[in-house]
């Protein structure tokens, strides 16, 4: 019984800024951008992975979450304490330069890690940590 990832979620505090980053800087395609019941359902994904969607959603969008929980999540996001995703690339250095040129907030320049990847890190416009890895070998 094989299991595959289909969808993951990244908390964003501004859909338009997030779309500009994930679409225009990272090169992900917009798969859905639908408004309903006061919410906005936005999904993006890598063109090379048509079966994997990333949902860009408000922090703790669960309608059953308390206002205190929502405030706590928004605070963690604002502090940049949420790790969102690790993306694989075939050229970490070129990816780094592309994201830096697009205005990404640099957290770590490309370095070789002892566990077999070349790695760099940025924050997205909402404060999420995103890592970009190139397998070595």
Label every model-predicted segment:
Residues 18-23, 99, 127:
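Conserved active-site tyrosine of GNAT-family acetyltransferases
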Residues 1-9, 29-123, 133-137:
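Vicinal oxygen chelate
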């Amino acid at each position: 019984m094989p299991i595959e990832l289909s969808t993951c979620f990244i908390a964003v505090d501004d859909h338009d800024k997030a779309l500009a980053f994930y679409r225009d800087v990272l090169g992900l395609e917009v798969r859905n951008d639908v408004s309903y019941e006061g919410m906005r359902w936005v999904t993006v994904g890598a063109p090379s992975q048509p079966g994997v969607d990333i949902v860009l959603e408000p922090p703790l969008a669960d309608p059953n979450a308390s206002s205190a929980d929502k405030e706590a999540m928004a605070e963690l996001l604002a502090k940049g304490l949420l790790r969102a995703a690790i993306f694989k690339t075939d050229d970490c250095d070129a990816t780094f330069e592309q994201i830096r040129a697009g205005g990404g907030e640099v957290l770590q320049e490309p370095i070789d890690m002892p566990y077999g990847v070349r790695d760099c890190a940025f924050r997205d416009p909402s404060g999420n940590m995103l890592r970009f890895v190139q397998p070595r070998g």
